[in-house]
Amino acid sequence: SGETEDVTIADIVVGLRIEEELGDAAVYAGAK
C-alpha cells in the first residue's frame, strides 16, 4: 500500500520540473 500515492507525488514533482524548464509549452502539453 502507499505505492499509488508515491507515484502520484513523483508525477507531480516531474510535472513541476518540466513546467519550470518548458514554461508555457508544458501547460499546452498538459492540456492535451
UniProtKB/Swiss-Prot annotation:
GO terms for cellular component: cytoplasm. It is an enzyme of class 4 (lyase). One of its GO terms (biological process) is glycolytic process. Belongs to the enolase family. Its cofactor is Mg(2+). This is Enolase. Keywords: Cytoplasm, Glycolysis, Lyase, Magnesium. Its main location: cytoplasm. Homodimer. Its EC number is 4.2.1.11. It catalyses: (2R)-2-phosphoglycerate = phosphoenolpyruvate + H2O. It is found in: Cytoplasm. Mg(2+) is required for catalysis and for stabilizing the dimer. The keyword GTP-binding does not apply. Pathway: Carbohydrate degradation; glycolysis; pyruvate from D-glyceraldehyde 3-phosphate: step 4/5. GO terms for molecular function: phosphopyruvate hydratase activity.
